[in-house]
């Protein structure tokens, strides 16, 4: 796994070098590469570009099953994908604002001076403080004001996480319903998984591999290329 970092182009080149070091020549006849995600245009050696929706849906089918609702909370957007018969039936996407994404939690954890895991641990013991702004910039200003007023950090942490989870639950609740599957980096945040299940009224299923659902789906799609 190669972190994207600032430049998708640099990450793409590092990945090509890592593949070569592992014995995979991207130009070889028996090697196929699929690019997906926001950096997909920065992979010149890709044999095909496939949408995130398709790749996450395919990966979720492999990890969980062929029907249900996939919730992917990424760094730049949140996706809700309905699966039927192992295929994507419909989807919804929030890519207009970071306030309902993992990036929002990262920003707020930085503002609180703690890691995302520490924020989740603190939130368990906190009372929810309402974060009402729908915009990341304004929400950050709210958090700064709360800190200035001496609001306990655990309460702010609870409010921040609840604000994200409630937005995600609203999106997911408009889909087909349970079973719900969580993919993306937030699947490793046990508190987020629990709170999302509480708001949806149904357990949210995930797995240690769920953060790689998009990559898994892309690999499966690559296997099918001639």
Regions found by a protein language model. Name each.
Residues 16-31, 168-179:
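Phosphate/pyrophosphate-binding loops at sites that engage ATP/ADP/AMP, CoA/4′-phosphopantetheine
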Residues 1-4, 23-54, 82, 89-90:
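Short beta-strand-loop/turn "lid" adjacent to the catalytic site in phosphate-handling enzymes
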Residues 85-131, 135, 220:
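Glycine-rich phosphate-binding loop plus the immediately following alpha-helix
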């Amino acid at each position: 796994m190669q972190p994207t970092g600032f430049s998708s182009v640099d990450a793409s080149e590092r990945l090509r070098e890592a593949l070569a070091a592992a014995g995979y020549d991207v130009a070889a006849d028996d090697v196929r590469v699929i690019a997906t995600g926001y950096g997909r245009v920065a992979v010149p050696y890709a044999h095909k570009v496939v949408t995130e929706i398709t790749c996450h849906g395919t990966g979720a089918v492999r990890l969980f099953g062929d029907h249900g609702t996939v919730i992917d909370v990424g760094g730049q957007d949140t996706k809700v994908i309905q699966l039927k018969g192992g295929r994507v039936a419909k989807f919804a996407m929030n890519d207009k604002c970071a306030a309902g994404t993992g990036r929002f939690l990262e920003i707020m954890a930085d503002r609180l001076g703690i890691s995302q895991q520490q924020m989740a641990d603190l939130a368990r013991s906190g009372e929810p403080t309402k974060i009402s702004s729908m915009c990341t910039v304004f929400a950050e200003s709210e958090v700064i004001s709360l800190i200035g007023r001496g609001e306990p950090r655990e309460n702010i942490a609870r409010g921040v996480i609840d604000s994200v989870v409630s937005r995600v639950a609203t999106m997911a609740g408009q889909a087909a319903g349970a079973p719900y599957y969580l993919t993306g980096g937030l699947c490793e945040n046990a508190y987020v998984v629990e709170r999302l299940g509480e708001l949806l009224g149904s357990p949210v299923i995930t797995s240690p591999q769920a953060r790689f659902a998009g990559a898994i789906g892309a690999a499966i799609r690559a296997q099918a290329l001639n």
